[in-house]
From Swiss-Prot:
Pfam family, one: DEP
One CC-aspect GO term: plasma membrane
Listed CDD domains: DEP_PLEK1, PH1_Pleckstrin_2, PH2_Pleckstrin_2
The entry's keywords: Acetylation, Phosphoprotein, Repeat
Alphabetized PANTHER family for the sequence: PLECKSTRIN
In-chain residues carrying the UniProt-annotated modification Phosphoserine: S113, S117
Protein name: Pleckstrin
Domain PH span(s) in chain numbering: 4-101, 244-348
Function: Major protein kinase C substrate of platelets.
SUPFAM superfamilies: PH domain-like, Winged helix' DNA-binding domain
The organism of origin for this protein: Canis lupus familiaris (Dog)
Ranges of residues in domain DEP: 136-221
Length: 351
């Protein structure tokens, strides 16, 4: 049987010979990590066995290069990967550590099911509950919260979740709410944000979920992001960088002159609505370019004459108010839909 694919996506990998950083399509399997030059390639450029390997995160060996983690094999070979943002790195680290642990224990990798361990009643439909929690009018309100000089965008507190469960009559009391919230967390419907909630989720507290105003959580597809809040009042950001970050990640972008496709890291901001793109391998903070989204049109594209038939999937196009065309490619249909929706929302806000 083929090893199960646990997670896949773009990461920047440090070369083992020339020490250069390059974006790769990375696939986490039950027994190893494969990396490809392009997502469409059939054969991997390399494979890292996970048996006996150790993982280090955060890895701060490279100064300003953020969100790096290191995998050291039994042969003492170090492999360095860089994610586009904090939550992406944490997801890779969490799943990779779990895969290594499963190999050690001779178990099959499975997302943690809390239904059995917490004795959750079979009548509780966590999926339906999650959709109710996300309801724009009656659900949990997403906020921008500040703690330890960091701003947590699109999140909410642990006690707000329990308040909502009780007031919505989903549970009879706060203790029962804690049990349900822990199950939602275990099944991936809620994600921890910040040290307090992450430590609890990793088993450092009595319950994985905290009924606490200082414990922050977010919905996995909400566009959550944590950013440093500079206390220096003299720093005046460029107007286009003032907007709140609502989504980020890697996409393929077509060049305007040569029409070739390259992996770029994108950061989407609203009010003012801008989509900045960066060279993920450079590790720098200066964008290669910016797309002003106010009044733009964004649509999915089913074919493009400049793209090979085998690589035509998940394309979309942004046409700015100045009629500049940008062609982008997501990794999956779901990811394309998420980007299109987020850009449409941003394009209608602010300047």
């Amino acid at each position: 049987m083929e090893p199960k694919r646990i997670r896949e996506g773009y990461l920047v990998k440090r070369g083992s010979v020339f020490n250069t950083w390059k974006p790769m399509w990375v696939v986490l399997l039950e027994d190893g990590i494969e990396f490809y030059k392009k997502k469409s390639d059939n054969s991997p450029k390399g494979m890292i066995p996970l048996k006996g390997s150790t993982l280090t995160s955060p890895c701060q060996d490279f100064g300003k290069r953020m969100f790096v983690f290191k995998i050291t094999t039994t042969k003492q070979q170090d492999h360095f990967f860089q994610a586009a943002f904090l939550e992406e790195r944490d997801s890779w680290v969490r799943d990779t550590k779990k895969a290594i642990k499963c190999i050690e224990g001779g178990q099959k990798f499975a997302r943690k099911s809390t239904r059995r361990s917490i004795r959750l009643p079979e009548t509780v439909d966590l999926g339906a509950l999650y959709l109710s929690m996300k309801d724009i009018e009656k659900g949990i309100k997403e906020l921008n919260l500040e703690k330890d000089k960091k701003i947590f965008n699109h999140c909410f507190t642990g006690n707000c979740v329990i308040d909502w469960l009780v007031s919505n009559k989903s549970v009879r009391n706060r203790q029962e709410g804690l049990m349900i919230a822990s199950s939602l967390l275990g099944e991936g419907y809620l994600q921890p944000a910040g040290e307090l909630s992450k430590n609890a989720a990793d088993g450092m507290a009595e319950h994985p979920f905290l009924d606490n105003p200082d414990a922050f959580y977010y919905f996995p597809d909400s566009g959550f992001f944590c950013e440093e809040n500079s206390s220096d009042d003299d720093v005046i950001l460029k107007e286009e960088f003032r907007g709140v970050i609502i989504k980020q990640g890697c996409l393929l972008k077509q060049g305007h002159r040569r029409k070739n496709w390259k992996v770029r890291k994108f950061i989407l901001r609203e009010d003012p609505a801008y989509l900045h793109y960066y060279d993920p391998a450079a590790g720098g903070e200066e964008p290669l370019g910016a797309i002003h989204l106010r009044g733009c049109v964004v649509t999915s594209v089913e074919s493009n004459p400049d793209v090979r038939k085998s690589e035509e999937e998940n394309l979309f196009e942004i046409i700015t108010a100045d009629e500049v065309h940008y062609f982008l490619q997501a990794a999956t249909p779901k990811e394309r839909t998420e980007w299109i929706k987020a850009i449409q929302v941003a394009s209608r806000t602010g300047k």
